């Protein structure tokens, strides 16, 4: 998927016309196992890059989801409150967590592209 950027903590950020969509990668959801609860950020929250923005809980563990870039939360995926398993079923699609405006789009340049992320996964898998 073009323009998607990744963190070493397995979050992705996908620019779109309204801002950028944030979620966790397929690798992350597979490591977590069955997701049973998601705590989403508050709309209007201003996040710094690297700050914890959400929490995902699975049958194995709870993990923070950090903001890959600075910005204001403009939308959350409320479907995850009713069906947190969407994170497992479609992490790059309907399992997204939140959308934010980008305070500084150049922050994305410091993140990995898909090729670099795939290489990174191979070093830890």
Curated annotation (Swiss-Prot):
Gene3D superfamilies: 2.40.50.100. Signal peptide: none annotated. The keyword Transcription does not apply. Residues 19-101 form the Lipoyl-binding domain. Binds 1 lipoyl cofactor covalently. Its cofactor is (R)-lipoate. The modification N6-lipoyllysine is found at residue 60. It comes from the Bacteria. PROSITE patterns: BIOTINYL_LIPOYL, LIPOYL. The glycine cleavage system is composed of four proteins: P, T, L and H. Belongs to the GcvH family. PANTHER family: GLYCINE CLEAVAGE SYSTEM H PROTEIN, GLYCINE CLEAVAGE SYSTEM H PROTEIN-RELATED. This is Glycine cleavage system H protein. It comes from Methylocella silvestris (strain DSM 15510 / CIP 108128 / LMG 27833 / NCIMB 13906 / BL2). The gene is gcvH.
């Amino acid at each position: 998927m073009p323009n998607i950027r990744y963190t070493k903590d397995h979050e992705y950020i996908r620019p779109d016309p309204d801002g950028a969509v944030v979620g966790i990668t397929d690798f992350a959801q597979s490591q977590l196992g069955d997701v049973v609860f998601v705590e989403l950020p508050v709309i209007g929250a201003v996040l710094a890059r690297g700050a914890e923005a959400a929490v995902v809980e699975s049958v194995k563990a709870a993990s923070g989801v950090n903001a890959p870039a600075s910005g204001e939360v403009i939308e959350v995926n409320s479907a995850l409150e009713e069906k947190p398993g969407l994170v497992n079923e479609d992490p790059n699609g309907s399992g997204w967590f939140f959308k934010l405006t980008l305070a500084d789009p150049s922050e994305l340049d410091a993140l990995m592209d898909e090729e670099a992320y795939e290489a990174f996964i191979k070093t830890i898998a």
